[in-house]
Each structure stands twice: as structure tokens, then as C-alpha cells.
């Protein structure tokens, strides 16, 4: 066997960010939390489904809380202290995700609802008859 030359690997330098933004996308089926820097570059993210919840348990407030804690702990490696929170969607995990980020130790400076609202755009889906 010929010896394969080893590639030199450099340790990735983690940038230090003091202020960040938390984007919470709470749909009826799942909750996605992304923590970014001021420019919008993702530092960490977590989902209810990726946190071990499957099926209808993904859409619970507790699953959103666990996902927010995972994203928050991962973003602390970058030195984030203050968060501006943007919440999108009507899901059940909206409020519990914000509370979980607060419990991790972040100072939440601002909470903004950025749920897209149509100005009479597309026709909505028909109502379910069960």
C-alpha cells in the first residue's frame, strides 16, 4: 500500500459575537430555532424533530423548549450574551421557545413577530371536515 499524504488540518477559529438574533419558526407541525449573528450568518440551530421528538410530539411546547435549549447552549460557544428574537408562525412552541432561551441565560432585548400576513393573496386551504 502506498502511503497517503495526510492533509494538514487547521483548528477552526470561532468568532466571538456579543449580540445575536434568534429566529423562531413555529409551524403547526414543528419548531425551528436558528441563532445568528447581526449579519444573519447562522451560529447554531435546532429543531423539535432533531431533538428526538417524532410525530405529533414534535408540535408540543415542550419539544420547542428542548430545541431552544439545544440551540442556545450551542451558541454560547460563540460568546453570545444578548438576543433579539424574531418569531414567525402560529405554532404552539412560540412562547415556550422564548422562555427557554431566557432560562439558558440570554438577555432578550427585543421580541418581534414577523409572521407573514397576506394582503388578500392566495386562497387558503379548505377547512377540514373530520
Swiss-Prot record:
SUPFAM superfamilies with a match to the protein in the record: Translational machinery components
Coiled-coil features, chain-numbered ranges: none
| Keywords assigned by UniProt, alphabetized | Ribonucleoprotein, Ribosomal protein, RNA-binding, rRNA-binding
In the UniProt record, does the keyword Cell division occur?
no
InterPro entries named in the record: Ribosomal_uS11, Ribosomal_uS11_bac-type, Ribosomal_uS11_CS, Ribosomal_uS11_sf
Q: Which domain of life is it from?
A: Bacteria
GO terms in the biological process aspect are: translation
Bilayer-crossing residues are: none
Asked if Nucleotidyltransferase is a keyword of the record, the answer is no
* Any one annotated GO CC term: ribosome
The molecular function terms in GO held by this entry are: rRNA binding; structural constituent of ribosome
> Per the record, a Pfam family?
Ribosomal_S11
Describe its partners and assembly state: Part of the 30S ribosomal subunit. Interacts with proteins S7 and S18. Binds to IF-3.
Q: What does the record give as the function of this protein?
A: Located on the platform of the 30S subunit, it bridges several disparate RNA helices of the 16S rRNA. Forms part of the Shine-Dalgarno cleft in the 70S ribosome.
As for family, the record states: Belongs to the universal ribosomal protein uS11 family.
Q: What is this protein called?
A: Small ribosomal subunit protein uS11
Source species, please?
Shewanella loihica (strain ATCC BAA-1088 / PV-4)
High-level lineage: Bacteria, Pseudomonadati, Pseudomonadota, Gammaproteobacteria, Alteromonadales
Amino acid at each position: 500500500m502506498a502511503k497517503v499524504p495526510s492533509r494538514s488540518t487547521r483548528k477552526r477559529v470561532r468568532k466571538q459575537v456579543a449580540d445575536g438574533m434568534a429566529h423562531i419558526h413555529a409551524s403547526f407541525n414543528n419548531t425551528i430555532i436558528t441563532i445568528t449573528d447581526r449579519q444573519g450568518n447562522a451560529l447554531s440551530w435546532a429543531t423539535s424533530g432533531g431533538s428526538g421528538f417524532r410525530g405529533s410530539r414534535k408540535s408540543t411546547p415542550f419539544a420547542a423548549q428542548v430545541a431552544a435549549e439545544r440551540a442556545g447552549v450551542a451558541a454560547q460557544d460563540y460568546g453570545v450574551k444578548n438576543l433579539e428574537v424574531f418569531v414567525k408562525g402560529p405554532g404552539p412552541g412560540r412562547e415556550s421557545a422564548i422562555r427557554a432561551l431566557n432560562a439558558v441565560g440570554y438577555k432578550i432585548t427585543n421580541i418581534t413577530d414577523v409572521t407573514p400576513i397576506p394582503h388578500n393573496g392566495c386562497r387558503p386551504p379548505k377547512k377540514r371536515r373530520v
